[in-house]
A protein has these predicted regions:
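Hinge/lid segment of periplasmic solute-binding proteins
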Residues: 91-144, 170-173, 178, 197-202, ...
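Extracytoplasmic "Venus flytrap"/periplasmic binding protein-like
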Residues: 50-119, 126-128, 154-156, 252, ...
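Periplasmic solute-binding protein
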Residues: 94-102, 122-161, 188-210, 296-305, ...
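Short, solvent-exposed loop/beta-turn-alpha elements that line the ligand-binding surface or hinge
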Residues: 107-119, 162, 204-225, 273-277, ...
Length: 422
């Protein structure tokens, strides 16, 4: 079976990289990003041109790949023995490839103290696998509660009624639907579920500290998940909440079907472009939190692959990409945040006008240094399998009427088999 999988990966690699992944020499640094083209083409072309001007013997080959294809394509390139030198990975992808020993340990090239002086501690922590730094932090984001002022006012609420905690949010969802007959929020609970993030913010762990045992069938976890499943079953959440993916979270808001969306402020631009009428009534509030007050950190990183033929130059380019000025320039193109301490102190993140974009930027910059990884299990190399098992258990509760405790017990049992096989 393993041989068949390897053959399929090799075939995939030939198909995926034919014509664009020619053998590299030591003077070519191949750099992959995740779904940043064509929107940011000008930025990357300019950045690469500047780097090559200062390093005339080096050529940067930039390849942008779809986010959903990232794991498959990187696995294929590794199987073919021709991976990129520098690769953009989300924090949860790091564990998978670090566990395969595919990523360079960066502290063998640059002192850990130097990295700690440059980057935010929470961002650097997101780039750590089994106590080893396997990537450099790049751009960051966190969550915000985006809401439609017009719909909120029409329902008889004021800005002071906007929920700030998950317990307030559940009450608000009920009251809004009772008053208007419409949904207040679309939030994924059954596919790309946000429930683990909610549990983490409420101080309820999904796994133990060394990620060897699942814990989300505790009485506290069962009670909280049951409260959200009651919201779904009683009609206070749209049916799509159980079956649609995270990619669909913005559409119900920008179409005016719901009054709120809990997501990254980076999506404000999409709302502005796709639904200017909705955007004109949009405001933003801090992320909803649980009893811990903690909120989620979303981190992008850049890693070096072990098979890079020029690790020194690859690291130099990765440091250039993530330096203060280049991160600041990138952040000015979207509502994202830098991972370097110095860039975060720039006036761009501390002052500005009264526009919504500025409000989101200043709020995010103020809150982001305290953001953390609430979904600790994402550090497991089989995070995607674990995620799917949990999602399926929630779907079985909503669609199959399986009791919450039974569904979570079954999911915990499956998780423990995987977590124990390390």
């Amino acid at each position: 079976m393993k041989n068949i999988v390897l053959i399929l990966l090799l075939i995939t690699s030939l198909i995926s990289f034919h014509g664009c992944n020619n053998p590299k020499d030591e003077n070519t640094i191949e750099f992959w990003t995740l779904q940043l083209s064509p929107v940011f083409d000008d930025y990357f072309h300019s950045l690469i041109k500047e780097y090559e001007a200062h390093n005339p013997d080096i050529k940067i080959r930039w390849i942008d790949i779809p986010y959903d294809a990232a794991i498959q394509k990187l696995l294929a390139s590794l199987a073919a023995g021709n991976p990129p030198d520098v690769v953009n990975l989300s924090a949860d992808f790091l564990a998978k490839f670090a566990a395969l020993n595919a990523l360079e340990v960066l502290t063998t090239h640059i002192p850990a103290d130097s990295l700690r002086q440059i980057y935010l501690s929470n961002a650097l922590e997101a780039c750590t696998f089994r106590n080893q730094t396997v990537a450099l932090p790049w751009y960051l984001n966190t969550y915000a509660l985006i809401y439609n002022k017009k719909l909120i006012t029409q329902a008889g609420f004021s800005p002071s009624d906007i929920p700030s905690t998950f317990s307030e949010l559940t009450e608000f969802l009920r009251e809004y639907k009772n008053r208007t007959g419409n949904y207040a929020l679309f939030w994924n609970i059954g596919k790309d579920s946000y429930l683990p993030m909610m549990l983490g913010s409420e101080g309820i762990k999904m796994v133990n500290s060394d990620i060897t045992r699942a814990l989300f069938n505790s009485p506290e976890a069962v009670s909280l998940i049951n409260s959200w499943m009651d919201l779904y079953k009683q009609g206070f959440l749209p049916s799509e909440s159980l079956i649609n993916t995270g990619a669909s979270i913005i559409e119900p808001y920008q179409s005016g079907r719901v009054a709120m969306v809990f997501t990254g402020p980076v999506f404000l631009k999409r709302i502005k472009d796709n639904a200017p009428g909705i955007y004109s009534s949009t405001d933003i509030a801090p992320p909803v939190v649980g009893v811990t007050g903690k909120h989620e950190l979303a981190a992008m990183s850049v890693a070096l692959t072990k098979k890079s033929r020029n690790k020194k130059q690859a690291l130099d380019f990765a440091l250039f990409l993530t330096n203060n000025q280049n991160q600041l320039n990138f952040c000015k193109l979207a509502t994202i945040f830098p991972s370097t301490k110095e860039a975060m102190l720039d006036p761009y993140f501390t002052s500005g006008d009264s526009t919504l974009e500025t409000k989101a930027r200043l709020m995010g910059a103020r809150l982001l240094p305290k953001a953390t990884r609430l979904r600790y299990y994402l550090q497991h190399p089989k995070f995607d399998i674990l995620r799917d098992i949990f999602d399926e258990s929630i779907q079985s509760i909503g669609l199959g009427n399986v009791p919450v405790k039974k569904a979570l017990d079954l999911a915990v049992r499956e998780w423990n088999i995987i977590l124990g096989d390390q």
